[in-house]
Curated annotation (Swiss-Prot):
Subunit details: Component of the elongator complex.
Protein name: Elongator complex protein 4
Associated pathway: tRNA modification; 5-methoxycarbonylmethyl-2-thiouridine-tRNA biosynthesis
Annotated compartments: Cytoplasm; Nucleus
GO cellular component: cytoplasm; elongator holoenzyme complex; transcription elongation factor complex
Pfam families noted in UniProt: PAXNEB (PF05625)
Annotated PANTHER family: ELONGATOR COMPLEX PROTEIN 4 (PTHR12896:SF1), PAX6 NEIGHBOR PROTEIN PAXNEB (PTHR12896)
GO biological process terms held by the UniProt record: regulation of transcription by RNA polymerase II; tRNA wobble uridine modification
One Gene Ontology term of the molecular function aspect: phosphorylase kinase regulator activity
Length: 334
């Protein structure tokens, strides 16, 4: 929260309820959490039984930062982060015009089905969240060349090393530190991505709880937003409870199993359930409450990451009102 007298202007950020906030790069996710990410937030992405769908949210997050000149940092204990070479580029006005539906529509067939007159004025149900265009503002088929992203590339991956590196970045030229009053160095937002934090590869993994407490304290005193990805399917409950306690916003991406894929064919190209486990804590006094929580997500290299409302198909086996299959009196034997 901004102190009295503070006047901070950072590209790509706005002030709401005396809180500095910025976009996550995914319109549907912004809509779900109330419009934008609040500064100093820690977002926990639970990639349940999978480690491929959270990458789309990370790439959107980094792409938004690069577009506005924010500083970006990423660390992954398993391998060199692949997201650096796959960060999508921002769509231009020309790209949006090329994707518009052409004016000349094909002539309707005489035998084509028409909607009943009684439903002619009824609005169509929209499953999308966010802008009505339902188009991602970033093109995942075109990638940013030579993105300016800091990568934690130490030979020995340790949580202590990550924290010390982040402290150095925050204090460098005082660009990301919160300072009261006007004047001083120009401020900028730091976007941090910590991938696969649940992997027990770090030498000091047993100090994960201490690391998260220090990270949260650092984020509260800085212009910083942190994304953390993990897989709760293989993490012990006490360890996962520590991760949940440190996060301000917690989401879970649960992919469909084989039976659910067959059952939910009507959902099209949806890949799984989107569970919003916890709302942003930094705005708990006046938090945004989503109108619906039955959500699904789609992650593709063409559309990026989209969150939609889950609509169940009609029950065709049930009889229509007024046509119940009740036996008539003449068919009853006495």
């Amino acid at each position: 929260m901004l102190n009295v007298g503070d006047s901070v202007q950072i590209a790509g950020c706005s002030t709401k309820k005396r809180l500095l906030e910025t976009s996550s790069g995914c319109d549907s996710f912004d809509t779900l959490i109330g419009g934008a990410l609040v500064n100093s937030s820690i977002v926990l992405i639970d990639e349940y039984r999978s480690r491929c769908y959270g990458s789309y949210l990370i790439r959107s997050f980094l792409a938004e930062g690069l577009h506005h000149g924010h500083r970006c940092f990423i660390a992954d204990p398993t391998e060199d982060p692949k997201e650096i070479n796959l960060i999508p580029s921002r769509r231009t006005s020309t790209d949006m015009q090329n994707q518009e539906i052409p004016n000349s529509l094909p002539a309707e067939n005489e035998n084509s089905m028409k909607i009943a007159w009684r439903y002619g004025n009824v609005k169509q149900v929209s499953s999308s969240l966010g802008p009505l265009s339902n188009e991602n503002q970033y093109d995942f088929t075109k990638h940013v060349e030579n993105p300016n992203v800091d990568v934690y590339a130490e030979k020995v991956f340790t949580l202590k090393g990550i924290y010390e590196t982040l402290c150095q970045i925050v204090k460098e030229n005082e660009a990301h530190t919160k300072s009261g009053g006007r004047g001083g160095p120009k401020k900028n937002l730091l976007r941090v991505v910590l991938k696969n934090i649940d992997m027990e590869i770090c030498e000091d993994y047993k100090f994960l709880g201490r690391f998260l407490c220090c990270l949260r304290s650092l984020a509260r005193s800085s212009y910083m937003i942190v994304y953390i990805t993990a897989n709760s399917f293989r993490v012990p409950k006490p360890t996962w409870r520590i991760l949940e306690s440190a996060a301000d916003t917690h989401i879970q991406l649960m992919p469909f199993d084989e039976n659910e894929k067959k059952m939910f064919k009507h959902l099209g190209t949806a890949h799984g359930y989107f569970h919003l486990k916890s709302l942003p804590r930094l705005m708990s006094v006046g938090t945004h409450t989503p109108p619906i929580l039955d959500l699904i997500f789609e992650a593709s290299s063409r559309k990026g990451f989209q969150i939609r409302v889950m609509h169940l198909p009609p029950a065709f086996d049930e009889p229509a009102p007024g046509h119940q299959n009740t036996p008539s009196c003449q068919n009853i034997d006495f």
